[in-house]
Amino acid sequence: MEHFEQTANLTSDRPDSDCPKELAHYPIMHRQPIHWGEMDAFNHLNNVVYYRYAESARIGYLQALGMFDGNMVTVLAQSSCQYLRPVTYPETLLLGVRCQRLGTTSIVMEYSYYSTAQQAIVATAEAVIVRLESNGKDKLPWTKAERERLFALEEKVGHVPKT
């Protein structure tokens, strides 16, 4: 599996044996260490932190495609997260991220949070992102070249996003 390195937290060039089977169909993986200050009163990873991690993974995905240079304007239209198992400090999560559906001006991102300590998926999430013109008002369609790069990346792990 080919991997892209755009930020320090994206895994790259690792052998398939290092990839948890649960994340084999995710073209990008974001490595996220848990920080002590992210715990809640019950010593679990606070629920809001999962959304921050998804944002970091999403930006890494777009950077890997050469689509996020800091000038791309996107807004979060919808998001959800299903918490399957508690996560506690110390821990490292691997976030698999992929495109579930690519619309004309939107992208539905899918995430799986894999615990290296528990060796299991501990949460899943989804986010609908809408791309805007630089003025932040008008929707901006994905170009043909961007769509082709995205589908080529997903195809490398045997995943085909819906359109």
Residue ranges and their predicted role:
Residues E2-H30, Y83, V87-Y89, Q100-T163:
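HotDog/MaoC-like acyl-thioester-processing domains
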Residues G70-P86:
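Small beta-barrel nucleic-acid-binding modules, principally OB-folds
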Residues E38-D40:
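Acidic, divalent-cation-chelating loop motifs in proteins
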Residues V49-D69:
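Active-site helix/loop of acyl-thioester processing domains in fatty-acid/polyketide metabolism
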